[in-house]
Regions:
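Activation targets extended, charge/polar-rich intrinsically disordered C-terminal tails
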Residues: 1-9, 194-287
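Alpha-helical transmembrane signal-anchor/signal-peptide segments
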Residues: 42-61
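Generic structural hydrophobic/aromatic packing signal, biased to beta-strands
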Residues: 3, 31, 48, 58, ...
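Glycine-rich catalytic cores of cysteine/serine-nucleophile enzymes that process amide/ester linkages
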Residues: 65, 70, 76-173
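Soluble catalytic domains of enzymes that build or remodel membrane lipids, polysaccharides, and related
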Residues: 148-224
C-alpha cells in the first residue's frame, strides 16, 4: 500500500508541473488507496503455514472447559516439525494462577509475551497472540501496520510455544515470571481469552502492530486499568509489571530478578521431558 502510494505521488509530480494541480491529484490518489485499503477484509480461509493451520476453539460448561486444536508440534528444527493438534480439558476450579514469558530476539525494546495458566500442581496451558502467516510469508514490522496479517490466538503446550523459542530459534532469549494474580483473576482472564478465541474463529481480525498486537490484547484481557508506554515498547513491560507489584520477585532488585528469570539453559536441559514446565520453573523467584 505505502509503496504503491509513493509511486503514484512520484508519477504525479513528474507529470504535473502545476503545484496546486499536482497536490490535488496526490490527495485524490491517497484517498483512492485509503478507501481501497479500508475494504480489505480478514479471512480464516487462506493457505496457512502448518503451525497456524488450525484455530483453537473452546467449549465451556460450568467449570469444565474443553479446548480444541491445542498445538503441540514435534520439532526437529525451527522449520522441520510435525504439526500436532490436540484436544484438552480443564477444570476451572483447579486454576492456580498465571505466569508470563518474554522472548527477545534483538532489540531490548521489543519482546514477545506469552501468558501461561496453571491448573493443579503442574498442568499448564500457554496462550500466544501472533500474526497468522500464509505459506511463503515472513513477518515484517512495517506490514504489521497495514492489514497484511490476520490475528491468531495460539493455544499450546509449553513444550511447543516456549521450547520453540528457547531450543530451536536462533538468537532468541526467554524469561519467565510468576504473576501475583489470584486464582479468581486468573480464571477471569482465562475465560476472557476463551471468549476472544471463539469470537475470532468466527469473525477474524487483522493484526495491527500498534493497536491489535500481542501486548495490547493481553492488557485488555487481563483488565489492566492503566496505560503505560511500555505496553507498546514491550521489551520493557517486564519492568512495568515489576514496578506495579504484579510479579513475585522474591524481593530481588530488578536487574538480579530478570537475570535469574532467564530460562534458555534450563529449557535446553529439559528438552521434551514431560516435566518440562516444572523444570524451567525450578529454583526461580516466585515458584
Amino acid at each position: 500500500v505505502s509503496s504503491g502510494y509513493g509511486i503514484a505521488m512520484v508519477g504525479t509530480l513528474l507529470a504535473f508541473r502545476g503545484r496546486g494541480k499536482g497536490i490535488a491529484i496526490c490527495l485524490a490518489a491517497f484517498v483512492f488507496v485509503l478507501l481501497w485499503w479500508l475494504t480489505l477484509k480478514p479471512s480464516n480461509d487462506r493457505d496457512w503455514q502448518p503451525d497456524v493451520a488450525q484455530t483453537a476453539w473452546a467449549e465451556i460448561d460450568g467449570d469444565h472447559v474443553t479446548i480444541h486444536n491445542v498445538r503441540n508440534c514435534d520439532y526437529r528444527t525451527e522449520g522441520d516439525y510435525t504439526p500436532r493438534w490436540e484436544t484438552r480439558s480443564f477444570d476451572l476450579s483447579q486454576i492456580r494462577g498465571m505466569d508470563i514469558f518474554f522472548t527477545y530476539w534483538g532489540s531490548p525494546w521489543i519482546a514477545h509475551p506469552v501468558v501461561s495458566f496453571q491448573f493443579g500442581d503442574h498442568d499448564y496451558i500457554a496462550m500466544s497472540i501472533e500474526t497468522r502467516k500464509e505459506v511463503g510469508e515472513v513477518y515484517s514490522a512495517v506490514r504489521g501496520f497495514f492489514r497484511y496479517y490476520e490475528l491468531i490466538y495460539t493455544v499450546s503446550d509449553e513444550r511447543d510455544v516456549v521450547r520453540l523459542r528457547t531450543n530451536y530459534r536462533k538468537g532468541e532469549e526467554s524469561y519467565l515470571f510468576h504473576t501475583l494474580a489470584t486464582p479468581e483473576h486468573a480464571r477471569a482472564t482465562f475465560l476472557n481469552y476463551l471468549k476472544k478465541i471463539n469470537r475470532i474463529r468466527n469473525r477474524p481480525e487483522w493484526y495491527n502492530a500498534l493497536t491489535n498486537n500481542c501486548t495490547t490484547n493481553i492488557a485488555a484481557l487481563a483488565g489492566e486499568p492503566q496505560w503505560d508506554w511500555r505496553v507498546l515498547l514491550n521489551g520493557r513491560a517486564d519492568q512495568m509489571l515489576y514496578e506495579r507489584g504484579d510479579l513475585a520477585t522474591g524481593n530481588l532488585p530488578f536487574a538480579q530478578f530478570k537475570e535469574q528469570a532467564h530460562i534458555n539453559a534450563a529449557a535446553r536441559a529439559a528438552g521434551d521431558d514431560p516435566d518440562f514446565s516444572r523444570r524451567i520453573r525450578e529454583g526461580r523467584a516466585g515458584f
